[in-house]
Amino acid sequence: SRVDYTCRVADLLAQLATSDKGLSISTCPFGYDSAAACEQSIGNVRLVVAHLQELHQRTGKHIHLAFEAEPCACFSDSGALIDYLATSFSDDERRYMGICFDLCHSAVTDEAYEKVLSQAERQNVTIAKVQISSALQRDSRLCSSSIGDLEELADSTYFHDFITSHW
């Protein structure tokens, strides 16, 4: 099950980590429809949190379960995810969870990062991880060989998130 898998990943991280600082596991927040954030999902998260608490007591490694807002998922923006975590879990439970703040996803959903950071602080939700994706901006002065190199990356293997604007 997903719970068992996540607990095994946490065990492995605790074994491999050379420090007890900044440890986290990223995961998708509850699936891709609103029914996913149900009591069963909350119960499953609580099982993982209980494992992380026990692991922390046993090893000294404090690992956060970091939920990442995903465009088109149950929680497509960080603000809604922060609200959900703040209202569905206790302060003690939230010591072992937080969000994985993906700046690319934030751009796709048109979220202001300053607002997300202040909301997380205000609602006592940890930013357990920050993902900073790099992006390329095409300069019309690129030589033809550079354009060819970029065209090789135009493949679904490399596709992640994108945003377009029309001026």
Where are these regions (language model features)?
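Active-site acidic/histidine proton-transfer and metal-coordination neighborhood
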Residues: 1-98
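Acidic/histidine-rich catalytic cores of soluble enzymes
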Residues: 54-166
